[in-house]
Amino acid sequence: ISWPDKYAKYNGEIRHNRAFLPDIMATFIDAAETTYPKTYHGGNEIIPLEGASMLPILTNTDTELHEYIFGEHFDNCVVWWKNWKAVKDQNSKVWELFNLEKDRTERVDLSRENPKILKQLVDEWNKWANTHYVYPKGK
């Protein structure tokens, strides 16, 4: 994000905070000092915005926007938490677990060594999936 008129003293600094696509819309809404609509065309409900504004990251590099980040696309599943990432591809029923701090290229599956962490991430992903129109798809 570059906003010289408002954040000039941070110009050129790089942030490594984790964010995802819905955070872009939330950031635009925050920057415009407006709110996300709840309805459109005479009262049709809009699904609430999922993201969080990234503007706080500009002034505080310790800001965590989300405890977990989730995703799913054509049965490819992902969940991030702290330095951990769990993934399952569309051809597999098995989740893999990676420590991104030690293994940025996701080469070493740690699911057997860390079953509690994997279970926590998969449980959180399933909660998210059940509330975000991922299921039912044969679960």
Residue positions per predicted region:
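Active-site-proximal N-terminal segment of extracellular/periplasmic enzymes that hydrolyze or transfer
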Residues: 108-116
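Basic, alpha-helical interaction scaffolds
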Residues: 123
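Short, well-ordered alpha-helical scaffold segment located
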Residues: 6-7, 106
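C-terminal cap/loop subdomain of S1 sulfatases and analogous C-terminal strand-loop tails that border
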Residues: 7-13, 17, 21-100, 117, ...
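Short glycine- and hydrophobic/aromatic-rich loop-to-beta-strand nucleating segment
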Residues: 1-2
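Intrinsically disordered, low-complexity polar regions and short flexible loop motifs
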Residues: 103
